[in-house]
Design a protein with these regions (language model features):
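Short connector loops at secondary-structure junctions
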Residues: 1-7, 106-116
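N-terminal beta1-alpha1-beta2 submodule of the flavodoxin-like/Rossmannoid cofactor-binding fold
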Residues: 1-64, 120-168
Length: 168
């Protein structure tokens, strides 16, 4: 119920590992995320895009603690009355892709439709998609745990090159 501040791109978190805003749960979440095996982020769809709150939350969480998410499976879910779900999923999946997170899919796009929350269970295909998504997430997390326990190393990450579209 507290408002979420948007990321100021102040880059203080790059030095401290924590966001400068401390009273809205983002830092507490990233601490808990260190011990998580995977993530599902869901959003209502407003005007054919994710809610501003989830953007504020994810911008700050991924900027301040991006390595916490690395090599952990992620899934996005969008809920709408009608349109905008695929655009919303695309926007949320960007956080996973840039953070080296495998993206969990399902048997259809990870979306549920309904005008109000009580409508969602009536979306038979949406509910089936959510059940399959849950099964796929569990399977991925189990596979990753077996790999980790067996000593399979994470892939090396090449760094150093950064391109700017402005050349002088």
């Amino acid at each position: 119920s507290k408002p979420l501040a948007d990321c100021l791109q102040c880059n203080v978190c790059q030095k401290t590992g924590k966001c400068v805003f401390t009273d809205d749960g983002v830092n507490a979440f990233t601490e808990k995320a260190k011990h998580a095996d995977g993530f599902v982020f869901a959003t209502p769809v407003y005007y054919a895009h994710p809610s501003g709150r989830i953007f504020d939350f994810l911008d700050r969480a991924f900027s301040s603690a991006g390595d916490v998410f690395k090599f952990k499976p992620g899934a996005a879910v969008a809920v709408a009355r009608r349109g905008g779900t695929t655009a919303s999923l695309d926007a949320l999946n960007k956080y996973f892709g840039i953070s080296q997170m495998p993206i969990a899919g399902s048997t259809y796009w990870n979306m549920v439709h309904g005008n109000v929350a009580e409508d969602a269970p009536c979306d038979a295909e949406g509910m089936q998609t959510m059940r399959n998504l849950a099964s796929n997430m569990i399977w991925m997390m189990r596979c990753f745990a077996i790999g980790k326990k067996s000593g399979v190393p994470y892939p090396d990450t090449e760094t150093g090159a950064r391109t700017n579209f402005i050349r002088r």
